[in-house]
Amino acid sequence: MKSQASKVNRGFAIATGTAIALCALAVSPGAEEQASLQLAAAVQTECDRLAGSPYDQQRNSEFAPVGIDDIDDSAVNACQMAYDATGNPRFAYQLGRALNKIQQPDHAMSAYNAAVQAGYPAAKVNFGMLMGRLGDEQAEFQLYQEAALSGNVLGAYNLGVAYRDGLGTKPDVSKALQWFEKAAAEGDDTAAFNIGTIYDEGQLVPQDDQMAIAWYDLAAQRGNTDAMVNLGLMYETGEGIAADAKKAAEMYRQAGENGDLFGAYKFLQMQELGIVPAPSDPSMPEGVNSLVLKPGDVETPTTVGKEI
């Protein structure tokens, strides 16, 4: 089975270029104040558009959330100017995300800390992660706990990981499950997958295949490829459920179509065994075929969590 997911991994040089003409606003005599207000509004809009997090319940919902890997470098300028103009902790947090993206963790910490001092929950999650990287697990735990108690989904997820793994606190599987369940109730697929692995592996609680299947199924429905693979393995071996090779193949197919190489390999293996039709699936990841993938070539991956 795929192993349990780890905690969430969550930067300061001002970029010289920007996607908006921040300095191109024409200012007529006597209109400096109006121009300043226009500029402030423009940079706030750009910061929200370029760097709003999918895990921040306080983000500007007028714009689609942006994953940390997709943040444009110009967000650094926009968010710095937006924060300087308003002092709004949301812009400090989004500045931290933009700085994280360009690999400036020290300056990202300064931006996150400004938001943390203002009580911004999402910033506490990212600042906690960075404190953990510096070796201060107690501060990491405290920040996750504060974020979780404020209702932040990723804070709840990371707090579950902390209780499961004993990060900054004593391991407590009951509390780990409690916080994973809170995150899962808000739609977090990795939290649901983690609950499934806890019951599947039976190391922290009595092993329970039915509970594992139920939580894997929920995670798979939400698009978690690790859960798809684990369900496929359970169907293939008849672990806790009637063996069904075709259902196993279907779970592997779905995982492969969503980019999971192990799932793709298992589906191709099923094709070679004649369990499903042999023609190659054009939706499989590029380069994945039975001629290049052999048993042992693909290591079962571990979900590493999400950037916010």
Range-by-range predicted roles:
Residues A15-A24:
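Bacterial N-terminal signal peptides
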Residues V43, A85-N88, A118-P121, G135, ...:
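Short helix-capping/linker turns of helical repeat alpha-solenoids
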Residues P29-D84, L293, T300, G305:
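N-terminal leader/linker segments that initiate helical-solenoid repeat arrays
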